[in-house]
Structures are given as C-alpha cells and as structure tokens.
A protein has these predicted regions:
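Partner-binding and oligomerization surfaces adjacent to conserved cores of proteins
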Residues: 201, 220-600
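Alpha-helical segment of the N-proximal tetratricopeptide repeat
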Residues: 2-24
C-alpha cells in the first residue's frame, strides 16, 4: 500500500474517532518513507494528522496529568510539521504549510490553557498560543493568492480573539483572581473584541458566499459573548434575539408570514429562556435517575445493556398539564366539546435537569429505584463550565419548521436526521402561578393580567443585573402576547401553532422548587428518529453518550436499600475501571428508606 493510501486510511479512522488506530496507520505511512529527505510534503501531512490525533485525545481526557502528556505529543508532532514545512522548496506552499502548523500549535497551547487548574500556568500557555497565532497571521499576509490570504488572515484573527476572550473568562472565573484583575480582564475582552471585528472586516472581501455566511455566524456568536462579558446587556440581548428570529422565521413562505408582533414576542421569550454556555457559566446542573438507568448510561454492571441518555416524551412527564400553562395564561385552552379530536402530528420531547444538586425532594421524586425514595443517583454536569456546546437554535424545531413551511429548502426532510442532539440548546423553565390568597406577591418576579397570573424565574449563575434585564424583557413579551390574543381576529390555528416554540418552556408554579432546565426537541410522530422502549412502553429520542461529560455521580442515601441490593463500592469499582474521571460520592441527606425495605 502506498504512503498516500495509508494517509487516506488514517484520515478516515480519524474522522470516525478511532484515534489509536489512526495513529498506528500514520506511523505506518511514515515508516514507508525510508529516505527522510524525500516526500517532505507527505511527511508534513503525516505529522499534522498525528498532532491532531493526540490533540483530540487530550481534549477527551479528564485527568490533567494524562492530558498534559498528550498535549506534549501533539505539540511535538506539530513542531516537526513546522520544521518540514520550512524545508519545502516551493515558497508559497512552504508558507501555507507553516501557517497550518502555527495554527495547530496555537490550538494546542490554547486548549491546554483551558484545561490546567493553575491560573499562572494557564497565563503562560495563553501567551504561547497568542504568539503562535500572531505568527500564523504574519504568514497569512505573505500568501500571494488574495482569497487564500484573506481566509487565512480571518482564521488567525478569529483564534487570536478566542485566545484573548478565553483568557479573560478564565481569569474572571478563577478563585485565585484578585480585585486588581478586573482591569486585566477588561483589557483582554477589549482585545478579543478588536480581533473579532478585524476578522469581520476582512470577511467582507471573501468571495465564497456560503463560507462567508458560516464564518460570520461563528464570529458574531463570539462577539455577542463579549457584549455579555462586558455587561452590555442591550447589545447582547438584541443580537441573541436577532439570531433566533432570523433562524426560525426568515425561511417562511411570503404568503405565510407570521405576524411581526407575535414573531417578536416569541423570539424575545426564547432569547430570555435559552441558556447558552456563556450564561450558564459554572452553574452545576443535576439529572436524577434510578440506579438501574444510571448503570445503563455508563455501561456498568451489564455492559451489553448500555444506552445513551434519552429525551422523553412530554406525554409521560410528571406534570399532567405539561404545555398547557401558557395557553391558559393567554386564554387559549381547547374546550374539546367534540366527541373526538385529531391526534397531534408532532410532540415535544425533553431531557430534564435541575440546579438543585443533591437535593432531598429531587432525590425523593426522581432518584429512586424499586419505589424506594433517595435510592437512585444524582448525575452532576458542568462543574467546570465545560458541558454545553455552542447551540444550534434551529435543531429543536426542524421537523416543526418543515411542517409549517414545506417550501423551505433549509429544512428538507433529509436534514432532520442530521441534527446533532448534543448541540440542542438548553432552556430554563419559567413557572406560572395562578393568584390566590396563599401565594405572596414576592414569590413571583412578574405579575400579569391584573395580578391574575404570576411568573417565577430564578437567577442563573448569580448574575443579578442580567437577571433583572431578563425579567424585564420576559414581562414585556408576555404582556404583548396577552394583548395580541385578546383580539379575536388573532386567535387562529396559524398563530396558536406558533406558540409551539415556547409553550413547553412554562410549567405550573407547583413545580417551582425543581428549578428545571430542559433540552427540548419537537419531533414528528411516525418519524424514524423516534424510538420505542419495550420496558417502559413509551417513545423517546436518543440524546447522547454522557459518560464522558458527567463530572460526578452522587449515590442516594438509600442506594443499597432496595430489593435489587446494589452495592455502592461495586458501582464505585466498576466506574473507576470504565469512567475513571467521574467522581463518585455518597449522599448523606436525612431520609429513611420507605417500603419495600424499611430502616434496619
């Protein structure tokens, strides 16, 4: 097999995440080149892919010592790549290959800076990353092909912006940071803002329209985050709302344009309740499950019985009025006086999380096995602020959008199965209260419709200023919705259907203590993405393999007090072998085991 064929096989293995096999294949290709003074471009290519393999492995590893070793190997290969690039005889090819090597060296230092715990060590790594990307920028300017030069300059400017913004966030969130660091943080955010704006300016000169649009969205997302970090709430919120509005409503048929006021209110509510990574910050979230489900999620006890986390149907949630609260607020309840009604073509599916970690009530309700309260598990996400990915705002609604707009090329049926579930956006649930003599006014931040209805929404990540801004925007949008639907002419199927975007983001006030967040997905009944569970006799959507993203599993107080007789040390032992980076702990919340097994 030729060197190039071996490289192709290695690339294929890399793209399928088989990094160890890819490394072996690339090393085999390297061994095929006996004269190391020949085939320099092939050697350069091999070193680049080897570096990327080790970088990907370093990103997936939780143990910092192991990660550092992998980063070191990645850097070694990219340095060799740079050395080989400088030996190439064609000047422009040499510059382009050097540019590529500097890019990946910068990425290695940046990702390592984000991993290490010590802030001083992180600053040193950020400095090296910035140095590499500045070299990348210099090389990009030397390329004679104008479009290639512009593209490479945009890339370098973008990653310089990422280096500055990431360093600012890291210092801001660091427990080692002092009050005097605020000026340093502000300077870093200003620097990031400058690089992102420079890259946008260059982007206007780029000819590839489709690629220009893609890059613009990415840069604008990070620019928007800078607005948030600098407490520029109006700019941040307006950009966030604009993206949602353009994503969900710009592809509709000209003959089916949604009322602008309704469109604006829905976009505002989505912008308030959507919680991207920058807003979630370091807030840990919990998912409670039975011990049997926990075993399946991590593939322990019975490896053949492993399963990804599921997104469950709204039909089987604990709230029988799921999705009805907002309709009642807007006086849009269906009376259902007919002898039969048509079944809905779509349904909402969600995976639920709570900001109440190791919480007694949550353990009693959702963390139980065999009917025994607090015998299940609490899975903790986002302790390090690295759980959420950049969300795809359209992902939850693609099948729904297809149904609303059959002529939209962006949402063809073939696209629906390609949704990356891990990029589904996270939403905070708001709670609707119905005013009575027992609900104090201070229990709700918002009161509507002459104090008939109240809205309860907790602050996220202890950012009181941003929370006040969100409350203001949510109140305005709900008032507009109430006013809109009071006009009988506006009460029609098209306008009511538009509420599908938001009605599952509200729950009854009785569930307020759950402090729920949810990942939401609308799915068409009968579509291939929906799966059936014989055990629970219910339908669901597969969500994601969460074994590499859970930070901690807290075993309930009564974990060992069920008929199944699970043992905590057995679970700990098997998790240490299977998922060594997940912390295992025991809850000591004061609760007796209810039947079938009582207190010893």
């Amino acid at each position: 097999m030729s060197v190039n064929d071996l490289i192709k096989e290695g690339v294929s293995l890399f793209k399928s995440n088989n990094f160890d096999q890819a490394i072996a294949k690339f090393n085999q290709a390297l061994d095929e080149i006996e004269d190391k003074n020949s085939q320099l471009e092939e050697q350069n290519n091999i070193q680049s892919w080897l570096g990327r393999c080790y970088l990907e492995q370093a990103l997936k590893v939780r143990d910092i010592t192991e990660a550092k070793g992998l980063f070191a190997q990645a850097i070694e290969h990219h340095q060799e790549q740079l050395k080989l690039a400088k030996q190439l005889t064609n000047e422009q090819t040499s510059i382009q290959k050097q540019n590529n090597a500097q890019h990946w060296l910068g990425r290695c230092y940046l990702e390592q800076a984000l991993k290490v715990r010590d802030i001083t060590e992180a600053k040193g790594l950020f400095a090296q990353a910035i140095e590499r990307h500045q070299e990348q920028l210099k090389l990009a300017k030397q390329l004679t092909n104008e479009q290639t030069s512009i593209q490479k300059q945009i890339n370098a400017q973008y990653w310089l912006g990422r280096c500055y913004s990431s360093q600012g966030i890291r210092i801001k969130n660091s427990s080692q940071a002092k009050d005097s660091s605020q000026n340093e943080v502000n300077d870093l955010f200003k620097g990031a803002n400058g690089y992102f704006l420079h890259s946008l300016k260059l982007l206007s000169q780029f000819d590839d329209e489709q690629e220009r649009y893609r890059i613009e969205n990415i840069i604008c997302y990070h620019l928007r985050n800078i607005f948030f970090l600098r407490s520029k709430w109006n700019l941040y919120f307006d950009k966030k709302k604009q993206e949602i509005r353009e994503t969900l409503f710009s592809n509709k048929d000209k003959g089916k344009v949604l009322n602008k006021k309704l469109e604006g209110s829905i976009s505002t509510i989505l912008a308030v309740l959507n919680i991207p990574p920058i807003e979630l910050g370091l807030t840990p979230l919990a998912h409670y499950a039975s011990s049997s489900v926990c075993n399946k999620l991590f593939g322990v006890v019975n490896e053949d019985d492993s399963s990804p986390m599921r997104i469950g149907s709204s039909s089987y949630m604990n709230d029988p009025s799921e999705g009805e609260g907002l309709l009642e607020l807007l006086s849009l309840q269906d009376l259902e006086l007919e002898n039969k009604v048509d079944c809905s073509s779509h349904n909402a599916f969600f995976a639920c999380f709570s900001s109440r970690v190791n919480d007694l009530n949550q353990f009693r309700l959702y963390g139980k096995e065999d009917g025994v309260e607090a015998s299940g598990c609490c899975l903790v996400f986002n302790k390090n602020g690295d759980w959420l990915k950049v969300p795809d705002i359209s992902a939850p609604f693609r099948s729904f959008l297809k149904n609303l707009d059959e002529n939209s090329a962006e949402f063809k049926e073939t696209d629906i199965s390609n949704v990356e579930y891990e990029k589904l956006p996270l939403y905070q649930v708001a709670y609707i209260a119905y005013k009575d003599e027992y609900i104090a006014e201070e229990k709700c931040e918002i009161w509507l419709d002459n104090f008939k209805f109240g809205i309860c929404l907790k602050s996220v990540d202890k950012n009181s200023e941003w929370h006040k801004y969100r409350i203001k925007k949510l109140k305005e949008a709900l008032q507009q919705l109430i006013k809109f639907f009071k006009r009988k002419a506006n009460v029609n199927d098209e306008n009511k259907n538009a509420l599908e975007y938001i009605r599952y983001l509200f729950k009854d006030f009785a569930f307020r203590d759950e402090e729920e967040f949810r990942v939401l997905k609308m799915a068409e009944i009968g579509s291939e993405e929906i799966e059936y569970c014989k055990t629970t006799k219910s339908i669901y959507l597969p969500y994601a393999d969460i074994s590499n993203v859970v930070d901690e599993v807290i075993l309930g107080t009564n974990y060992e007090k069920t008929h199944i007789r699970y043992k905590a040390e057995v679970f700990q032992h098997q998790m240490k072998q299977k998922c060594p980076n997940v912390k295992i702990s025991r809850s000591s919340l004061p609760i007796y085991a209810n039947p079938p097994i009582k207190k010893d």
